[in-house]
Amino acid sequence: MSNQIKTNSPRAWLLAARPKTLTGAAVPVMIGLSLAFADGGWQRFLVVPALLCLLFAFVMQIDANFVNDYFDFKKGDDDEHRLGPRRACAQGWVTSQGMVVAIAITTVLAGLIGLPLIFWGGWEMVLVGVCCVVFCFLYTTHLSRWGMGDLLVLLFFGLVPVCATYYIQRHTLTTEVLLSSLACGMVVDTLLMVNNYRDREGDRRHGKRTLVVLIGEKASELLYLSLGLAACLIGLVFLFPGRYCTFILPFIYLALHGHTYRQMKTIKQGKALNQILGLTARNIFIYGLLFTIGVLLDVAFIK
């Protein structure tokens, strides 16, 4: 495949951007926006900042993908033993110099997209944006090698995007929003779990102490299942105000998640786990969709 792709061509950059990962970036924003809409209605829903939040999430995800591609290549992590999808720099689809320029462009672009959000969310949005950029780099260069990748996913694919999106719309935070952000981070972390589960032997070889390497195969399998289960159980918070659909619908996701878990346990190792990665990404998007639909249905029924 690498021989058919011209270096630095549009197709090469499309592959480097990893568009399939954008669903994971969209889910936290979807959840934050749906909760804001439920609590404020159409009259108070701000369309422009909603679109900016979504666009910022997309560009930051692409930026993170570029950073990951470049630094893993420089550290020699993407060698001939790699089990996951091939990476642009390692395959020669994109030059390392070109990737550095792309990282700079996407970082600046994310900043320009996020800057207007100060108008709606206040200057604290600057801190949010800076943290997103800083930890985007720290994840690949240091923290993912020290078993902190899962914590960062909980923060930057859960707490930060869900709460920031909601806060921009409503200028406050609620218990339901905070718990929903935690649930979202748990669901998205299943993707990192299966990724590191697949790469556990290679990571051990390269000295990467991911959570999977630290706790072992069996515990990692159980944690993968437990993350999805815990996320759905957190939805109990919606029963008390009578938001039954928001609680019930995500259990459809849990059924899919449980089936994917059984497949993962059967496959155990090798490139065949890439299909579990794809199924997990699908499940994450379905969770976000079900949660959003549940929130909107509750708005209709409660009114």
Where are each of the predicted segments found?
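Membrane-embedded alpha-helical segments that form the functional core of polytopic membrane enzymes
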Residues: 30, 41-67, 126-137, 176-194
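Multi-pass membrane catalytic core of lipid/isoprenoid biosynthesis enzymes
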Residues: 80-120, 208-243, 281-287
